[in-house]
Amino acid sequence: MEIRYSALRLDGDAQVEADAARDTFWELPPGAESDDAVFDKQMWVQTVMYRWGICGYTAYVSNGDVGSGERAAASVFFAPPSYFPGSLAMPSGPVSGDAILISNVFVDQPYMGLYLEHSLIDTVVTEAERRGIVAVEAFGRNDADTPEGSYFPEGYHGWEERPHSGDLEGAPVLSADILEQQGFEIIGKHPRFPRYRKDLNSAASLFSDFEADTHALLNNSAPLSTVLGGQWA
């Protein structure tokens, strides 16, 4: 099995994990509903890339056989908190003004257990450090008090139903365990949905092993295209 990481681009929705491509919990204000979630997510990605820069990465998995192709197995999104109005619904917010927010790592179920959440978070941290960002924050789901019989996989991304009216149990939120393993510390306390922070230029996590040239390669240094304003650039 081979795993390849790449920054999101604007030349096809195959670049995003399937559930990530249609989930807009973080990208819309609390209580807002989307008539076309896939389109809204695409426009969000285009807008953020045009105004701020790279805002996501995808992990592609293949079996290594020639001609077998690869699949978008996991995707992560990150940006300044103003681009994630859905974060206002989180009880341990708001996100600090000097930090960017990782909204979630969406992992396709067959690929859970490959530590894609960890490696994608490390990729975001590397990119944030490269851009001189002070800190990265994320909201976590604390499953320590989960009722017996309930089950949320590590990379749970709310496939059951998009939450309404303050019900966050179906929200796409990272596991608190993953964030703690990645060196994040609680900055906003809450029994169920604490907010975590990682100040940058600290010790690398167990999964971090990116050289500068390798990171530049996965960032796809070619010029970005956009359809904002009805024109390609």
What function would you assign to each model-found segment?
Residues 58-60, 77, 195-199:
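Short, well-ordered beta-strand micro-motif
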Residues 27-66:
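Active-site rim helix/loop that mediates acceptor-substrate recognition in acyltransferases
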Residues 46-51, 65-105, 147-153, 159, ...:
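Conserved acyl-donor/pantetheine-binding loop and adjacent beta-alpha core of acyl/acetyltransferases
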Residues 102, 136-138:
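Conserved hydrophobic beta-strand within the GNAT/NAT acetyltransferase core sheet
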Residues 107, 112-129, 137:
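Conserved acetyl-CoA-binding loop-helix of GNAT-fold acetyltransferases
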Residues 130-134, 141-189:
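Conserved active-site alpha-helix within GNAT-family acetyltransferase domains
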Residues 171-232:
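C-terminal "cap" of GNAT-fold acetyltransferases
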Residues 1-30:
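Conserved N-terminal entry element of GNAT/NAT acetyltransferase domains
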